Amino acid sequence: MASMTGGQQMGTNQGKGVVAAGDKLALFLKVFGGEVLTAFARTSVTTSRHMVRSISSGKSAQFPVLGRTQAAYLAPGENLDDKRKDIKHTEKVITIDGLLTADVLIYDIEDAMNHYDVRSEYTSQLGESLAMAADGAVLAEIAGLCNVESKYNENIEGLGTATVIETTQNKAALTDQVALGKEIIAALTKARAALTKNYVPAADRVFYCDPDSYSAILAALMPNAANYAALIDPEKGSIRNVMGFEVVEVPHLTAGGAGTAREGTTGQKHVFPANKGEGNVKVAKDNVIGLFMHRSAVGTVKLRDLALERARRANFQADQIIAKYAMGHGGLRPEAAGAVVFQSGVMLGVASTVAASPEEASVTSTEETLTPAQEAARTRAANKARKEAELAAATAEQ
């Protein structure tokens, strides 16, 4: 049957100069869907989990640090003056970083033409951008406490240093989520002991990690979920507490603080190191799994809290919305902070299917950095290969 020719196609844009093969639905009405697809909300995770102080004026805040003393027995006739030990004092100072701002300009003509509201969402996004900057700064300061050079890594000698815990395998070997989760749990066991050895209070301990590491912990605990009902909620995919640490999922773990430009890291105030091994850097973007701390490890000083300001820009016929705050962030207690990082050693290669001789198996490459556990595993593999070769030879002779 022949195709119909002619007939009205009202949706097609048939104006002068328009190609006939244009959109056949172009002229039909686009109905507002009733919902604006705004960006997902970003939530600050550090605000309630570290020390925050407010000042009414000035450029910085002082945090005095006191050391410890020791008791000693006093025998008859001895003088206390001969045994006295001075309690050392020092201080930590957090300086206000400056006035951090985010703003948007809404032109009257565009606002009049628009058929949906944008002001509330713009306001939310401005506030979120400042919250993310504060989060990034606090997390970068935790990493900073782990990277301080040895002559400055304690507030007062004897109070303790930051703890950096390596996994027993390197990053390339921990692609399995369950294996990674077990490594993180084992590291948190060591972290718990390290903080307790520094007399850090058991309460208010937090472990910040990215979504991959958070999911890995869940995967490691899931097979025994019934036994860990107090720790995880498999239905919601959430973790409450592991080894005394509140586990917090942070997508922006290594973002760092704000800079002098809206795009990129130009003039960034609190930088999260990019690469391990540069100077004293032990914790960086390329090896960090998570950061742990007590709430007193890092501090924030507020000169002006988060505020919103609306201004009329008559010369542009527009309204301006400004979000701003004046804060400073800094590390306070190295002994109450630490990080879990991937092992920096070279990964063992996959065992060859060709049986090696005992002499060959006993040779360890000077290029490989092996832990005792890896050395034992390699020896067991070599012994197994030797036995299989001997068995195959005996079978062939028969």
Curated annotation (Swiss-Prot):
| GO terms under cellular component | viral capsid
UniProt subcellular location: Virion
Q: Where is this region: Disordered?
A: 359-398
The record's keywords, sorted A to Z, are:
Capsid protein, Virion
**Sequence ranges of Polar residues compositional bias:** 362-372
Task: Note the superkingdom of the native organism.
Answer: Viruses
Q: Which GO terms fall under biological process for this protein?
A: viral translational frameshifting
- Which InterPro entries would you find in this protein's record? Capsid_Gp10A/Gp10B-like_dom, Capsid_Gp10A/Gp10B_dom
Q: What is its main location?
A: virion
> What is the protein's known function?
Assembles with the major capsid protein to form an icosahedral capsid with a T=7 symmetry, about 60 nm in diameter, and consisting of 415 capsid proteins. The major and minor capsid proteins are incorporated into the capsid in about a 90/10 ratio respectively. Once the capsid formed, encapsidates one single copy of the viral genome.
Task: Give the record's subunit note.
Answer: Interacts with the connector protein and the major capsid protein.
* HAMAP family, per the entry: CAPSID_PROTEIN_T7 (MF_04119)
Task: Reproduce the miscellaneous comment text.
Answer: The minor capsid protein is produced by a -1 ribosomal frameshift near the C-terminus of the ORF coding for the major capsid protein, producing a protein with a C-terminal extension compared to the major capsid protein. The major capsid protein is produced by conventional translation of the same ORF.
Q: Give the family from UniProt.
A: Belongs to the T7virus minor capsid protein family.
Q: What is this protein called?
A: Minor capsid protein
Native source species: Escherichia phage T7 (Bacteriophage T7)
